[in-house]
């Protein structure tokens, strides 16, 4: 049965509207800011107290790339960061309770090394961490009143306070909250690409672990990429996922009409 036709009347939807501005601050460094309006509706008709949630958030990102000398060749080193979903809380019950947005910090670096005039190889590393505080869990021997006090404190934190506390409140330790992605890419003449990578997430956070392999082909105005994911843990919905992406080069399209 389709979920929309179920007796529970579920009809969820998510919508976001973004406005972004980017600027090159120097020959090697650039930054971008994105402002976002979010509307989220769980779509359940069974609970009359359920309302669509509205929130505002922002992304702040920066990107640096420089050439570094490695032997007789110049390799391109890059570093970037992204603070995403920094904003207000969201409520689905008219403001009685407010939930934290899934703010996230991403740090990434890469090195692209030219083997010769036609062949290049790149290695990349990404680190991700959600900046959402842990909801309090009742401890052994704790009274209901003390537990409720901690819950009330948790709900009263501002979005910024919650983001900062997320770096120190994990019962598993900070390092186990960090998601790690590593990858490598070989390219020939900037037209043919072969890629491979691995994603790791601790079992206490989400337990996503998978390998990925892919290939790409670039022409003057478009690029076609494909990737295949293989999970290393059971019951992963991403297992054996095949993805395709098609991108267009706007400058290349403009040149066709000149």
Task: Go through each PLM region and give its residues.
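Outer-membrane beta-barrel porins/channels
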Residues: 4-258
């Amino acid at each position: 049965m389709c979920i929309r036709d179920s007796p529970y009347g579920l009809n969820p939807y998510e919508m976001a509207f973004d406005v972004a501005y980017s600027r090159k601050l120097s020959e090697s460094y650039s930054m971008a800011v994105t402002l976002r309006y979010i509307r989220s509706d769980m779509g359940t008709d069974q609970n009359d107290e359920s309302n669509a949630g509205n929130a505002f958030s922002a992304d702040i990102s920066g990107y640096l790339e420089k050439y570094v000398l490695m032997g007789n060749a110049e390799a391109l080193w890059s570093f970037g960061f992204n603070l995403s979903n920094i904003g207000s809380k969201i409520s689905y019950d008219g403001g009685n309770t407010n939930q934290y947005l899934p703010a996230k910090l991403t740090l990434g670096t890469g090195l692209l090394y030219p083997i010769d005039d036609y062949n290049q190889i790149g290695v990349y590393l990404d680190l991700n961490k959600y900046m959402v505080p842990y909801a309090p869990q009742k401890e052994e021997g704790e009274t209901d009143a003390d537990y409720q006090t901690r819950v009330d404190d948790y709900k009263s934190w501002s979005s910024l306070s919650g983001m900062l506390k997320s770096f120190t409140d994990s019962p598993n330790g900070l390092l186990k909250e960090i998601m790690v992605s590593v990858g490598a890419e070989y390219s020939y003449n900037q037209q043919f690409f072969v890629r491979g990578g691995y994603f790791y997430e601790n079992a206490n956070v989400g337990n996503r672990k998978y390998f990925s392999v892919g290939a790409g082909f670039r022409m003057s105005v478009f690029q076609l990429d494909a990737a295949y994911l293989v999970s290393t843990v059971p019951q992963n919905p991403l297992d054996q996922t095949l993805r395709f992406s098609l991108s267009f080069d706007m400058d290349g399209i403009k040149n066709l009409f000149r």
